Amino acid sequence: DQFDCVELLKPLDYQSRYGHGTNQIVLGPDDMLYVVSGNDVAFPEGVAKDSPYREPHDDHLLPEPRDAVQDVRVGHVLKTDLDGKSWEVIAGGFRNPFDLAFNSAGELFTYDADMEWDVGLPWYRPTRLNHIVSGGEYGWRWGTGKWPEYFADSLPSTLDTGLSSPTGLEFGTRGSFPSPYRDALFMGDWQHGRILQVSMSPQGASYTCEYGVFLEGGALNVCDLTFGPDGALYFITGGRGSQSGLYRISYDGVEGDAAIAAVAANDELVQRDRDAAAARELRHQLEEFHQRSDASGIDLAWPYLNSEDRWLRFAARLAIERQQPAQWRDRALSETRPRASTAALLALARLGRAEDQTALLNALDRLPLESMGSSELLDALRVWELSFIRQGSPSATDRVRALARLDTLYPHSSNYVN
């Protein structure tokens, strides 16, 4: 057999620093192609200007000069139709994610690499599983510039797995393994010669995870894995001069219905799953406004600026940020609920309009900083930081006022706040 034809859908600009190129193409449940690339690949020409993820910035108030000479390429996920006619950037801020996988609810995940040189340093980011959402910013930047997870304009990892070399991803729903493997995510680790098994629990609009070792062995450099049409798990090994091989793991038992029925009948789990499904559906409704200019999105999103769920708050803030500033600026400046105020002012600061700076700083001054928890306080400090980065240096009056306000917080019990 041979291909009838070979057609170039899109040239991708690969400028090698460390071999972090375009790694995988996956067909999504929406019959669209999802392409994941590492941080050596620039956004291709012709991507939609209204993509959910746009124009990554370093956004450090005191950048490291040696990092500043690097461009702002980040690992990212593209989405395109089967003909390759329309392209958009879904999410970014990764180092070198190797693969993508959708769970049974249609939620997307990737397994991102750490930077081994950074081990033991404050900016080290462990190898991590990320839940990919519309417009998601996951904070990888060059050198020392990696964002801490508490930055309000980013999203946290869903699971950290420490030192490893991420490779293939696959959910057990494609195989014939019994419970609990059926709902697990299988992740390849080339460095340690193992396959990890991740169990997920819905939490709000995202998930929490636990993991264990499903399989490991010496000289078992797992490169990729997938479930075959027979329901078995296939994986391939090799690379960098190591032994290459193709392996199959199959289940030869019969899954009983009793255990599945017992879990399904657990009222607490049923209610948890219903609540989580509703939260994810709400997040999807908010995400529709990440690419749509429609003032109705402001009223829909505004209540969720005050949500305790970080994933809902992120989706709501981005939905508002994508609307015309004149439609929500005054509402942001007059918001009185501390968490909602911080999220709204974050959106205003990210727009980088110098004419809004004094009013924004005045609104920040009204926040009850002394009574706010550490996480809310860090969110507020991020707004000050982004104002000075994107809106420009403050006036002498604004500078003195900001120094006086922030000086009252030091020293703080949180090292991150300090």
Regions found by a protein language model. Name each.
Residues S134-Y150, S154, V198-N418:
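Extracellular/periplasmic ectodomains of large secreted or surface enzymes and adhesion receptors
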Residues D1-E288:
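Beta-propeller domains with acidic blade repeats across secreted/periplasmic ectodomains
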